[in-house]
Curated annotation (Swiss-Prot):
This is BTB/POZ domain-containing protein KCTD7. GO terms for biological process: intracellular glutamate homeostasis; intracellular potassium ion homeostasis; membrane hyperpolarization; protein homooligomerization. It comes from the Eukaryota. Residues 1-42 are annotated as: Disordered. One of its GO terms (cellular component) is plasma membrane. SUPFAM superfamilies: POZ domain. The keyword Nucleotidyltransferase does not apply. It comes from Rattus norvegicus (Rat). It holds the Pfam family BTB_2. CDD domains: BTB_POZ_KCTD7.
Length: 289
């Protein structure tokens, strides 16, 4: 007779995938009942599974081989169907997992034959692969679009100081203005600039090839805050202002917001001599409903 031991202290890996022991721990809470919870007076015996396993994943029915579920040892599915844990069954005898089964078929197809999901399912299947701790599937999905492109985008945004904070500020300002004005939308000004210093003086084309020589004490003359709600920049990367604008629209839209923007001019703040700020200013329109 085998006694089900208590849970080991929890330890997590930083890469998002879990070891088999961690997967078992997550499975045990709360999906796996203890011997007492299952209504038994004695410790549970190891559970045996048929060669062909009927599954009920949140109401979606699947059938697969036991060897498919155990294909990769360090996964939650392998731990669940190892025989060491009790898995409840539904009224038809299908083994029940309390999880949305919409994309479980894509997970099974990978376990069966290594097939990868279509591009439009990649994000959703990646979420399922994280839940079931299927490392090989995670690795391949992260080399597919759109996840691969998202890695590149995040590398660029990592150079942007306080990007997430400023993004939240845009949303909060737009919300407050819409509430105060009882309006469907709100507008705000956003400055996006790649370079800290102006390169050419204002309205002096003959000096286009010159840079203003300044001492350290002159630096304060160039330091100012444009009269806008939020500013992004500067940064050192090939990506330009339009790339950052695309990121802003993408991330705001991902929050369910309708976003429009247009350039409404530049900052005309006078700095020194013939030099003006000239940072571009964009008007963002956030529509709430």
């Amino acid at each position: 007779m085998v006694v089900v031991n208590g849970r080991e202290p929890d330890s997590r890996h930083s890469d998002g995938a879990m070891s088999s022991s961690e997967a078992e721990d997550d499975f045990l809470e709360p999906a796996t009942p203890t011997a007492t919870q299952a209504g038994h007076g004695l410790p549970l015996l190891p559970q045996e599974f048929p060669e062909v396993v009927p599954l009920n994943i949140g109401g979606a029915h699947f059938t697969t081989r036991l060897s498919t579920l155990r294909r990769y040892e360090d996964t939650m599915l392998a731990a669940m169907f190892s025989g060491r844990h009790y898995i409840p069954t539904d009224s038809e005898g299908r083994y029940f997992i309390d999880r949305d089964g919409t994309h479980f078929g894509d997970v099974l197809n990978f376990l069966r034959s290594g097939d990868l999901p279509p591009r439009e399912h990649v994000r959703a299947v990646h979420k399922e692969a994280q839940y079931y701790a299927i490392g090989p599937l995670l690795e391949q999905l992260e080399n597919m679009q759109p996840l691969k492109g998202e890695k590149v985008r995040q590398a660029f945004l990592g150079l942007m100081p306080y990007y997430k904070d400023h993004l939240e500020r845009i949303v909060e300002i737009a919300r407050l203005r819409a509430v105060q004005r009882k309006a469907r939308f709100a507008k705000l000004k956003v400055c996006v600039f790649k370079e800290e210093m102006p390169i050419t003086p204002y309205e002096c084309p003959l000096l286009n090839s010159l840079r203003f020589e300044r001492s350290e004490s002159d630096g304060q003359l160039f330091e100012h805050h444009c009269e806008v709600d939020v500013s992004f920049g500067p940064w050192e990367a090939v990506a330009d202002v339009y790339d950052l604008l695309h990121c802003l629209v993408t991330d705001l839209s991902a929050q369910g917001l309708t976003v429009d923007h247009q350039c409404i001019g530049v900052c005309d703040k006078h700095l020194v001599n013939h030099y003006y700020c000239k940072r571009p200013i964009y008007e963002f329109k956030i529509t709430w409903w």
